[in-house]
């Protein structure tokens, strides 16, 4: 019995060597599944597992069995596919029911050799040397006969009935071995496509609609014959393409001179980590900073209050938005409009006298002005110098207009001195602002570098933004740059 099984296995291995690899992977669908494949455009009766998966995807798309909103859900109730699956719906994220149906309705090429007529017909069509069932039996008998001749003296001759029993068992073992071999190959074919539950439309259209390409920032890579699209947006990384070469070289040299301690590798790491943050800051710098109404950086502390109408205005405004009064201490070269100045120390405008009131025959004193916090110290010194309670001249105010004129003239002189001091300080600040950028030395200083609660206005907006994107520190105090804003000087 052992000799017969051994010879059968040898004949099986010889026949397997004569079968082409393409025919080993081919399967024959059963009639219900074959109708579905033909409805999807398939031709013939022998297919590979990949072709069966392709035509199944085409069938689902043609019949529109999938949900339009959730396309991974396939509703096959009342359809031939639903009858084969034995269920009303399934999800392509879990294609195990579909694979179970294919294992039941696909017959491998080696299993079809159990029918001798079908095997001979397939051999004639494909012009392949595929042995029939009778040839397998004959080769097994010849090998067993030669084996028996060598052991003729030791083993007695078996009866005819026992020979038939041995042949029948031998055929069953042969078919079982072939069926197990091809079933394992069929399982391998399914495992090849079962990659994390890929959807049917991806499997069905992969070969025809997707080709590997590399174009710009979009790449299509292949992994085990399965396409994986990897899309990367590099528009934020290519911002320097829109700038001229001279600006890149000039600013690059200035950045290295400003911060010599930072290496190029550290700059690269910091720039990679802050790509998203720079993109957000660019939106604020380019669009929102151009409008005073939408400026998110202007707080209520920076606004100035008009002394005429008490309205708070933006620090970049020269005149009050409501009453059009000029802001005090704007610039020293501005002509002073005495009729509409919004100032805290007006000393030359007399008030209208109230009609019908008995007043002394002397010049009226000027009403106390609105004192801002920064002018409180100056006014306090002036009040100490001319305290009406301690001054002897206060007793003569009602009787002598000359003494009152003297006091008012001295007060005006002190106010003029304080105004001249503030004007000189403003002139120095204006001269510093009129200097060009400390990096490019071409553009004006309109880029304010913010770090914490302080900032430095030493560069133009273009160079300041380049420093921020490069991850460099402030060229003055070496602090980390948190924000760059554009300053408008009207």
From Swiss-Prot:
UniProt free text on domains: Region I is sufficient for binding TP53 and inhibiting its G1 arrest and apoptosis functions. It also binds TP73. Region II contains most of a central acidic region and a putative C4-type zinc finger. The RING finger domain which coordinates two molecules of zinc mediates the heterooligomerization with MDM2.
GO biological process annotation, one example: protein ubiquitination
Disordered, as annotated region: 129-160
Induction per the UniProt record: Down-regulated by cisplatin (at protein level).
One GO CC term, this protein: nucleoplasm
PANTHER family: MITOCHONDRIAL UBIQUITIN LIGASE ACTIVATOR OF NFKB 1 (PTHR12183), PROTEIN MDM4 (PTHR12183:SF37)
Encoding gene per record: MDM4
The protein, known as: Protein Mdm4
ZnF (RING-type) residues: 437-478
Location of region: Region II: 246-332
Subunit structure, as described in the record: Interacts with MDM2. Interacts with TP53, TP73 and USP2. Found in a trimeric complex with USP2, MDM2 and MDM4. Interacts (phosphorylated) with YWHAG; negatively regulates MDM4 activity toward TP53.
